[in-house]
Amino acid sequence: MSYQQRANDSMNSAKQYSSSAGAVHNSDEPFSSSGAPQNRNFDTSYTSEIPSNSSRAANDMGTDIGSGDPYAGMTSDTKKGFNSVESRKKEQSDVRGGDTSYSRRHDDSSYSSNKYSTGGNDSYSSGGRNEDYSTSGGSYTTDPSRTDDTASYGQSQYNQSRKTTQGGDYGEDYSQSYPTDTYGSRQKATPSDTVGGGAYDYSSSGSHTHGGSHGTEHRGGSYGNDNTANKTRGAVSSAGYSGEGYGKGTYATDTTAEANRRAATGTRNARTTAQRNAQLAEDEHVSMGDKMKGNMEKMAGKLTRDPELVQKGEDLKTGHHSERY
């Protein structure tokens, strides 16, 4: 056998071992997308056929496969270019540049740890915009000297200057001008508008008693004498009408009939209390039960020395509800 033929046989043997023999050969299904059965003992993503040591060594030295030592780069035991699992792993690592230097330096250090995790996030959380708007941004809420748009809605205007609470356009001036002066305590304390139904409208001198818009007429105007005599009965008319309300001594009886009777007899305020009560009892037809109840309450008031209870019993007897209640 010639020297050239032996070199070709050695190269073919190395190629056949690298693609088929190995320690374990799985041929039941293809490993790559090309469909060609390949050895699964190592990754073949960078080359479909890994060259032997002899052929690669010959090419690296720039020599022809047929010249020089045909066994250059091969191991001494098999003369096939692979000695063990470690040598196959080294071959794989040398062909594609190495797993460690490629994946860890490229993926972990450059893109994961340094650029996007440590350097990237820190620049946006510690020293970036977040700090400008959170830590240094306290001037938006606590700095009273700020005059921009954010400061006008911040703490200084609403809390320190209190524009809308105590010292501003809608604050203290507003509360004094509208609720306090018009509807509040100043209105009742300073009756500047008494005659027109202002400050004491609903108190003792208001419009419904004898100081407001109906006040003067109430006592001496169109409703004057008739109202005082007929609806509130006599000398305690103002007290009965204003202090007791509308249901106590004011409209308890048929005021129209009483007014007609008094207008016909001409006895307005000229009768005594006994005469008036007797007439009221006659007009209203007090029942026997009310009379008995009035007697009992009157006696109880005398025993307990309670003048109000005595008066209440008298009112029940006569059918008249006193202006005192």
From Swiss-Prot:
Annotated region described as Disordered, given as residue ranges: 1-325
Positions in coiled-coil regions: none
Record field: compositional bias (Low complexity): 200-210, 252-278
GO CC terms in record: cytosol; nucleus
Domain of life assignment: Eukaryota
Comp. bias intervals (Basic and acidic residues): 86-109, 282-325
Biased composition (Polar residues): 1-21, 29-57, 114-167, 174-193
Protein name (database record): Uncharacterized protein C23H3.15c
